[in-house]
């Protein structure tokens, strides 16, 4: 099935903190009966993170109500200063697998539109049957929104290179 959404917003008590425009979703809704959200493709013309959401007090963790499987997703991601202290615009592509009671895996690539060469690449796998794998590479030559989103100074050069593997106990 294909679904299209012209405008999607997510809000909390302070108002809208995420806005997505012109979403297209190709998914298998029958999988919901198996407690799985399964999408072949999710794409949006743009997704704006306007500010950080407020987090309500957390109750007892009951786990995820369903597994998430996204074969391919892509968008133009806009990080506003209210979210990352400096505006950033990125072309983002990723895939995602999150099991209700188990492993998580994603590969993500974000390339800056405003500052060519600035990027974030992530390959993450944890839990489930396989070993832990974390490979992260990011660079903002003059600082930027990725550093700001991580709580670091957005106006200083930022470099991240992480390689980890092993097991979780």
What does each of the following model-derived ranges do?
Residues 2, 7-9, 41-48, 71-76, ...:
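Small-residue helix/turn framework positions
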Residues 13-27, 67, 83-97, 113-123, ...:
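Amphipathic hydrophobic-ligand
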Residues 57-63, 85-110:
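Short, surface-exposed polybasic-and-hydrophobic patches located at secondary-structure transitions
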Residues 1-82:
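Flexible beta-edge/linker motif
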């Amino acid at each position: 099935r294909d679904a299209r959404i012209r405008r999607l917003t997510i809000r909390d008590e302070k108002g809208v903190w995420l806005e997505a425009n012109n979403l297209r979703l190709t998914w298998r809704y029958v999988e919901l009966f198996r407690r799985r959200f399964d999408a072949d493709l999710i794409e949006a013309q743009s997704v704006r993170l306007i500010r950080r959401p407020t987090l309500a007090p957390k109750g007892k963790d009951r786990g995820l109500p369903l597994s998430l499987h996204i074969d391919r997703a892509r968008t133009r991601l806009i990080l506003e200063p209210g979210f990352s202290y400096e505006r950033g615009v990125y072309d983002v592509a990723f895939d995602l697998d999150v099991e209700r009671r188990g492993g998580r895996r994603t590969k993500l690539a974000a390339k800056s539109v405003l500052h060519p060469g600035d990027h974030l690449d992530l390959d993450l796998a944890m839990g489930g049957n396989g070993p832990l794998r974390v490979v992260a590479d990011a660079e903002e030559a003059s600082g930027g929104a990725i550093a700001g989103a991580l709580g670091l100074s957005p106006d200083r050069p930022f470099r991240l290179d992480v390689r980890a593997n092993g097991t979780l106990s």
